[in-house]
């Protein structure tokens, strides 16, 4: 590892330990030339797939886009920022676990809707209305009827 002070390429590891969250290894190093100490962090590289859009374009997976969409759907609902982050983290983890190089937006959208449905039904309907691009009120009503059927027709 190159010393940030003198540029020498050789060092020794003085101390090595996991970070609190277990997501990285912190290493204290000492340069063999100038003997100054510096810290490095080693972490697993997140390898997220390319997202294949409906029109066939490909772009890098962007967590921020999912956060924005979910947060918009959850506006003025009793859903905390922590719950939004947890939902998006779960979707991101699911995408990583698939191990695919490419993933369709439909897979991501369905994963988000599945989790939103259990988190907040109003947010789910809001997200679904944008994601599924309902063409008219009839399609919207069909989605609501399906939601009511799956909930056993309970009134809230």
From Swiss-Prot:
Kindly list the cysteine pairs connected by disulfide bridges.
none
Zinc finger (unnamed) in chain? 3-34
What is the species of this protein? Anaeromyxobacter dehalogenans (strain 2CP-C)
Q: Which UniProt keywords apply?
A: ATP-binding, DNA-binding, Metal-binding, Nucleotide-binding, Repressor, Transcription, Transcription regulation, Zinc, Zinc-finger
The yes or no answer to whether the keyword Cytoplasm is present is: no
InterPro entries, A to Z:
ATP-cone_dom, NrdR-like_N, RNR_NrdR-like
Q: For the ATP-cone domain, which residue ranges apply?
A: 49-139
Please name the Pfam families in this protein's record. ATP-cone, Zn_ribbon_NrdR
**Under which name does UniProt file this protein?**
Transcriptional repressor NrdR
Could you say which protein family the record assigns here? Answer: Belongs to the NrdR family.
């Amino acid at each position: 590892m190159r010393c940030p002070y003198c540029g020498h390429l050789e060092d020794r590891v003085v101390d090595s330990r996991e970070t609190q969250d277990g997501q990285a290894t912190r290493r204290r190093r000492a340069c063999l030339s100038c003997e100054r100490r510096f810290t490095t962090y080693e972490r697993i590289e997140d390898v997220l797939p390319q997202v294949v859009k409906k029109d066939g374009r490909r772009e890098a997976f962007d967590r921020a886009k999912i956060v924005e969409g979910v947060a918009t759907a959850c506006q003025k609902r009793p859903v905390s920022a922590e719950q939004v982050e947890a939902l998006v983290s779960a979707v991101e983890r699911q995408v990583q676990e698939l191990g695919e190089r490419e993933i369709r937006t439909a897979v991501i959208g369905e994963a988000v809707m599945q989790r939103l449905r259990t988190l907040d039904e109003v947010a789910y309907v809001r997200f679904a209305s944008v994601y599924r691009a309902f063409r008219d009120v009839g399609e919207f009503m069909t989605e609501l009827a399906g939601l009511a059927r799956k909930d056993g027709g309970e009134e809230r």
